[in-house]
């Protein structure tokens, strides 16, 4: 192998020693080219007379500590035993791999630096993508795919196609989900409730793109309420000034409304609407994988999807698998249809504070008025079959309705087209289950006096849609379940306000022999008669336009304080003072148990619940 020589020279002017490479080195050896080209000065470490000392011994001392004493280099003394020659040079033969290492050390450093930045950029990009896709919920790159062991190709199974189920199917399908809806009966429903949609619910309908479902079904605009008590009446209008002219409540035939939403959902190519009866949820290791159902031909089938949403209504047979239901039946509704009846206030719902409980009237078409007579739970429900119901309606209820409605009411009773249904109340008590979630009346119910059920259901759908929208994949059921716990917290302020108002108003509006309760009922009517914020505030709560818990509590106790003030003026007496105390304690006894069942913390301080912040990872 050809020897490589290091040469040292003294510059004649600067007396500095320069080091340059021997021709044996590669012309591309950048480090030495750099020195040779610019002749960078190196401080002399030995004189020319001692250049012979820069021999194999010194090279060994420089190389061995770094590379070890091995066969990678061979140093030979070329002095031929001639010690008198001071300019003799030591030729050090170095293996090519050592030369290559020295030659590319700078290039290696630059390449390593560039590689580090490339890897950092890739890692950061993946992390940002992961955050955008749901804070770790998305585990695969398949967009909206279903991984269930069966090639069903379905992302979401919706059990039930009522108001909640049909609206939910349409909403999720618009976001690209493949939805399989299983409904027990696809014929047009015929119900006596779910016929009044408050303005707040109509706004949610607009937000979901379903507002046209109230068109072409002869739906009637509702702009407020008329309240009647002991021959007196007041008109309460919705505070709609800040909204467009189209925003108002709507009243209609429930079945027509549901059929329109079913048709709209089924018109989407990624929605499969099937008639069948779901008998059970399919679970595997605590995770719901799908449902077992019977189709219209009686065949037992199974359907699989990463997420199953149960919306099978107030008579749900699946809710016990997903929550701890505490269903109460505070009363029954007796339903009638009055034909060609002119109500005292056009485009208003009508509430009569009758004895023993309220009576409702509202238009459901241009020629029909729905009448709902409440029969409290403590009273035996008269039988329709033996004529007791007709007798009760004529003798007890008819004398209390407004004169304008009396004849139409009696005529409707005579037709004997009377129907009843239980009014159910159930606070939301979810048991988060991987792979499944409850919605609608299967999940949460309140007394239908205020007509807030559809508003709550549609509001819940908007919240769930917003939570699911950023997620491309739903197959990690456990992670998804943990993430969707935020749904139960986010819905609380709106849902709990409407639920509490419904329960509290029903108890206040019912007649009672208790003097304190009578004063509370009278105070409520007179408080609403004051107008201004005393009427706008409660009506905004009732309409779902301002469902704020603090506003509800403020107005409820303002009514109680107003009632106490009336008792103490002009001159308080011990008897009236005691009655005022009972009125306040009675008011607290009405509202606090309802709020406790709903959950004080979630209702008033949702931001203190850890699950509340899980949604922020995606937002």
Predicted regions span which residues?
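Glycine-rich FAD pyrophosphate-binding loop
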Residues: 157-161, 170-193
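Short, low-complexity, Lys/Arg-enriched N-terminal segments of secretory-pathway carbohydrate enzymes
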Residues: 1-100, 129-139
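FAD/FMN-dependent oxidoreductases across multiple families
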Residues: 381-488
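Predominantly flavin-linked oxidoreductase catalytic cores and closely associated redox partners
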Residues: 147-151, 264-401
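A short, basic/flexible loop-to-alpha-helix module at the beginning of a structural domain
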Residues: 119-153, 298, 441
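C-terminal helical "tail/cap" subdomain of flavin- and related membrane-associated enzymes
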Residues: 109-113, 117-126, 410, 466-619
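Beta1/beta-strand and adjacent pyrophosphate-binding region of the FAD-binding site
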Residues: 144-164, 180
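A conserved beta-strand/loop capping segment in the N-terminal third of enzymes
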Residues: 200-262, 284-287, 294
């Amino acid at each position: 192998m050809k020897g490589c020589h290091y040469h040292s020279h003294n510059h004649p002017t600067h007396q500095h020693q320069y080091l340059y490479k021997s021709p044996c080195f590669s012309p591309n050896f950048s480090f030495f080219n750099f020195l040779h080209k610019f002749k960078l000065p190196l401080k002399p470490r030995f004189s020319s007379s001692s250049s012979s000392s820069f021999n194999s011994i010194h090279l060994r001392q420089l190389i061995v500590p770094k590379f070890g004493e091995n066969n990678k280099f061979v140093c030979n003394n070329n002095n031929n035993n001639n010690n008198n020659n001071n300019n003799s040079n030591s030729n050090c033969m170095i293996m090519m791999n050592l030369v290559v290492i020295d030659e590319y050390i700078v290039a290696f450093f630059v390449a390593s630096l560039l590689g580090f930045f490339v890897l950092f950029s890739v890692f950061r990009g993946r992390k940002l993508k992961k955050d955008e896709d749901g804070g770790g919920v998305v585990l695969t790159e398949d967009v909206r795919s279903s991984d269930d062991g069966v090639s069903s190709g379905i992302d979401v199974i919706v059990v039930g196609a009522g108001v909640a189920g049909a609206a939910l199917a349409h909403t999720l399908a618009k976001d690209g989900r493949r939805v399989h809806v299983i409904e027990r009966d696809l014929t047009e429903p015929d119900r006596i409730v779910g016929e009044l949609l408050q303005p707040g619910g109509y706004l949610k309908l607009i937000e979901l793109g379903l507002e046209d479902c109230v068109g072409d079904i002869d739906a009637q605009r509702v702009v407020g309420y008329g309240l009647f008590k002991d021959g007196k009446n007041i008109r309460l209008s919705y505070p709609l000034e800040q909204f467009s002219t189209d925003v108002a409540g709507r009243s209609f035939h429930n079945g027509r409304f549901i059929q329109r939403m079913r048709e709209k959902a089924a018109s989407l190519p990624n929605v499969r609407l099937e008639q069948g009866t779901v008998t059970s949820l399919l679970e595997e290791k605590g995770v719901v994988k799908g449902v077992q159902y019977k189709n219209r031909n009686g065949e037992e089938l199974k359907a699989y999807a990463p997420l199953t949403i149960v919306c099978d209504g107030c008579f749900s047979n699946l809710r016990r698998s997903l929550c701890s239901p505490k269903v109460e039946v505070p009363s029954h509704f007796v339903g009638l249809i009055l034909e060609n009846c002119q109500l005292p206030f056009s485009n208003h719902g009508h509430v009569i504070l009758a004895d023993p409980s309220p009576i409702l009237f509202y238009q459901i078409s241009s020629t029909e008025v729905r009448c709902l007579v409440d029969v409290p739970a403590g009273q035996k429900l008269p039988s329709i079959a033996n004529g007791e119901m007709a007798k009760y309606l004529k003798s007890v209820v008819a004398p209390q309705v407004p004169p304008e409605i009396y004849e139409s009411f009696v005529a409707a009773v005579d037709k004997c087209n009377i129907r009843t249904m239980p009014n159910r109340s159930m606070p939301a008590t979810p048991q988060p289950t991987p792979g499944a979630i409850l919605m609608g009346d299967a999940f949460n119910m309140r007394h239908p006096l205020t007509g807030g059920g559809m508003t709550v259901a549609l509001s819940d759908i908007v919240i769930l849609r917003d939570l699911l929208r950023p997620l491309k994949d739903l197959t990690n059921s456990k992670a998804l379940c943990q993430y969707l716990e935020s749904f139960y917290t986010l819905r609380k302020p709106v849902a709990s306000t409407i639920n509490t108002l419904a329960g509290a108003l029903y108890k206040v509006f019912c007649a009672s022999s208790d003097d304190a309760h009578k004063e509370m009922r009278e105070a409520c009517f007179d408080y609403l008669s004051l107008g201004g914020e005393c009427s706008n505030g409660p009506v905004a709560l009732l309409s779902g336009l301002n469902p704020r818990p603090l506003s509800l509590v403020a107005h409820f106790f303002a009514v109680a304080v107003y009632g106490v003030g009336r008792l103490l003026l002009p001159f308080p007496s011990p008897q009236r003072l005691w009655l005022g105390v009972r009125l306040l304690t009675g008011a607290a006894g009405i509202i606090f148990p309802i709020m406790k069942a709903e959950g004080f913390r979630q209702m008033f301080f949702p931001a203190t619940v850890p699950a509340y912040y899980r949604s922020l990872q995606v937002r």
